Swiss-Prot record:
Glycosylation sites: N73, N287, N382
InterPro entries named in the record: Glyco_trans_14
Lineage: Eukaryota, Metazoa, Chordata, Craniata, Vertebrata
Membrane topology (Lumenal): 35-455
Membrane topology: Single-pass type II membrane protein
Protein name (record): Beta-1,3-galactosyl-O-glycosyl-glycoprotein beta-1,6-N-acetylglucosaminyltransferase 4
């Protein structure tokens, strides 16, 4: 027994010595910067190269002489030129580094510098757009740089923007959103913020809070559109105004009769519970049946996304029927996916459609273009990016399809999946805005000349 204890003690001493020696060697290698030689990292790609190598961000990278090789011709991507598509695919194989929330906080800390960096002063606007302001409700919770790019893409000084961030979002994300709001008189943070849980009434409440604030603004916006941080526009502001005018007061959203698979979402009581996967908390179905909807309302389903007229929004904030239906929906699963789709069918509501009218599918509604895995190759081409919960995160090869499909916005985008697509989309939309405003100005000048000749 004595010999065993001695050997055991000696073995422990050996293990401790080897552990300390290993730690010392790793520290030495790190100090001498030998790690890159022994464990070479993948080549990196900086999504925002000029900013990431500037003093305006928190995590600054050294400049690289190889930056020029990363230039991708967006017209070539649009035309599916093999060389440009190949470049985008090569970039995706690298370690993609985008700006972190702290970087967005840093670059928005000085509003004048930020607006110059992002060239807000170069945004063009027509008289038609000035006379047709649009309101936006942005419900966001992560990736400040994605939200910043979205706002920059849809920003016009005559529009109005409400940002609702999740109360459980990281503090740096909240700081970035607060900084963005401080830099513009027409961007603000919702006066009431929610802790948003997936498929819970809190998601609907977040949009509701923004709608309430937007109505109180002095800006007489014509339509309101809700977006999330993974959305991006497919139309320039000029095009969007033209499309909205053509609605002539009607609303635009998905509204279909519920398939049997979805009826349990609102016929049974759901409770918010802890779950052992992604969302942490989720409304879980119980065995308790719900009563019928108030006022004999017929339930329709759709998506959380809408394009609503000002008259519609004013109506719902002054309707006891809508108030009762909102309360009834609180213990359902994903109420935002039936609430708006149902309201638009209520008789007499501004811009609504009859409950007997045909279904309006997600492809017929132009509010959001989403590519579902199980419809790929049937309703639309295959995804060239990746998938998250059966939804396509688009790749650069889908640029042309996205722009030509006819929708106004699309979901999902992720710069760390494909950074080239969002760059090319932004570039194409800016080109379209400049082109249409130039044509509009020529038309205005021509009409003015005709009137002067008439006089």
């Amino acid at each position: 027994m004595k010999i065993f204890r001695c050997c055991f003690k000696y073995t422990l001493q050996q293990k401790l010595f080897i552990l300390l020696l290993t730690l010392w060697l790793f520290s030495l290698l790190k100090l001498l910067n030998v790690g890159r030689l022994l464990f070479p990292q993948r080549d990196i790609y900086l999504v925002e190269y000029s900013l990431s190598t500037s003093p305006f961000v928190r995590n600054r990278f050294p400049e690289s002489g190889d930056a020029a090789r990363d230039n991708v011709n967006c017209s070539g991507v649009y035309e599916h030129e093999p060389l440009e598509i190949g470049k985008s695919l090569e970039i995706r194989r690298r370690s993609i580094i985008d700006l972190e929330d702290g970087d967005v906080v840093a670059m928005t800390s000085d509003c004048d510098v930020y607006q110059t960096l992002r060239q807000y002063h170069e945004k063009l606007v027509s008289r038609e757009e000035e006379d047709f302001p649009i309101a936006y409700s942005l419900v966001v919770h992560k990736d400040a740089i994605m939200v910043e790019r979205l706002i920059r893409a849809i920003y016009n000084q005559h529009n109005l923007y409400c940002i609702h961030y999740d109360l459980k979002s990281p503090d740096t994300f909240k700081a970035a959103m607060n900084n963005l709001a401080k830099c513009f008189p027409n961007i603000f943070i919702a006066s009431k913020l929610e802790t948003v849980e997936y498929a819970h009434i809190s998601r609907l409440q977040a949009d509701w809070n923004c709608l309430s604030d937007l109505l109180k603004s002095s800006v007489q916006w014509k339509y309101v559109i809700n977006l999330c941080g993974q959305d991006f526009p497919l139309k320039s502001n000029f095009e969007l105004v033209t499309e909205l005018k053509s609605l002539q007061g009607r609303n635009m959203l998905e509204t279909v009769r519920p398939p049997s698979a979805k009826t349990e979402r609102f016929t049974y009581h759901h409770e918010l519970r802890q779950v052992p996967y992604d969302y942490m908390k989720l409304p879980v179905k119980t065995n308790v049946s719900k009563g019928a909807p108030p006022h004999n309302i017929q339930v329709f389903v759709g998506s959380a996304y809408f394009v609503l007229s000002r008259a519609f929004v004013k109506y719902i904030f002054n309707s006891s029927l809508v108030e009762d239906f909102f309360a009834w929906s609180k213990d359902t699963y994903s109420p935002d996916e039936h609430f708006w789709a149902t309201l638009i069918r209520i008789p007499g509501i501004p811009g609504g459609i009859s409950s007997s009218s045909q279904d309006v599918s997600d492809l017929q509604s132009k509010t959001r273009l989403v590519k579902w895995f199980y419809y790929e190759g049937f309703l639309y081409p295959n995804c060239t990016g990746s998938h998250l919960r059966s939804v396509c995160i688009y790749g650069a090869a889908e640029l042309r399809w996205l722009l030509n499909e006819g929708h106004w916005f699309a979901n999902k985008f992720d710069s760390k999946v494909d950074p080239i697509l969002m760059k090319c989309l932004a570039e194409k939309l800016e080109e379209q805005q400049r082109k249409l405003i130039a044509l509009s100005s020529e038309k205005f000048m021509t009409e003015g000349t005709r009137q002067s000749h008439t006089l």
